[in-house]
Amino acid sequence: GADRQTCVIHCAGIVSVASHPGDRIYRVNVGGTNNILRLCAKCGIGKLVYVSSVHAIPEKPEGTEITENAVFSPELVRGDYAKSKAIATALVFDAAKRGLNASVVFPSGIIGPGDSGKGSITNMLLAFLSGKLPVAVKGGYDFVDVRDVASGITACAEHGLPGHGYILSGHYASIRDILEAAKKTLNLRRAVSYLPICFAKVVAPIYERWSFKSEIPSLFRFWDDEMLACKRRDEVVLPEIVLSKIVRNSYDR
């Protein structure tokens, strides 16, 4: 059974970029985390690592670096996914204050092989490959290789301090960068028009309803025009991403 030698890594959850994902996202992301915390305390486990998300961290003005030292509240973030992760993160830190040896990691946009659940970036690449992505959004995000996230989680399990959080980031890539890398890596000829963020925000609700009915991935709400600059800690050092390699690995599943 579980004891002081046991390390629990809580990475289960629902990721959704939908504007209205429903109550299930709270039942799983918040309720599930609460259950894990209760069982960890009951069984006296030695270590808990909770896999949160950078979406749980409140945004700062453009050009300002975000850090793990933040107040986690659903009132300070946008979208149900971010709110659910912020609530769950606050629960974990509260448990750490009560004596649980718990640390939190905050991955940025995870990309790489083995995405059986087909996350947003994988869906975008698959849609692009099949010719179902006529338009995309200007802007981009900070992406991190899933294998580097796994290494970061392991490092946190071994060296993470109780009540501390660690951002697991890679580097910024624009949507254009990703699609151009896909074209070059996979020898594709695809034409894509790039919409300004301001226009994308206007048409996103309509596109989301249309994509749901036509089974085309809803992508607009995932992207932000602000660069996510993450502060890295010495305890969890991650290597740089080679974008073309990750694109290739995303297909070679």
Regions found by a protein language model. Give the residues of each.
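A conserved pocket-lining segment of Rossmann-fold NAD(P)-dependent short-chain dehydrogenase/reductase
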Residues: 73-76, 124-144, 148
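Substrate-positioning beta->alpha
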Residues: 35, 87, 120, 137-157, ...
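NAD(P)H-binding glycine-rich loop region in Rossmannoid oxidoreductase-like domains
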Residues: 1-31, 39
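Conserved catalytic-site region of short-chain dehydrogenase/reductase
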Residues: 17, 54-64, 110-119
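Conserved Rossmann-fold NAD(P)-dependent oxidoreductase catalytic core, especially the SDR/UDP-sugar
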Residues: 22-23, 31-81
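Conserved beta-loop-beta element that borders a ligand/cofactor-binding pocket
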Residues: 52, 90-113
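Mid/C-terminal beta-alpha module of Rossmann-like enzyme folds, strongest
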Residues: 152-215, 244-253
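A hydrophobic C-terminal alpha-helical subdomain
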Residues: 136-138, 146, 197-235, 246
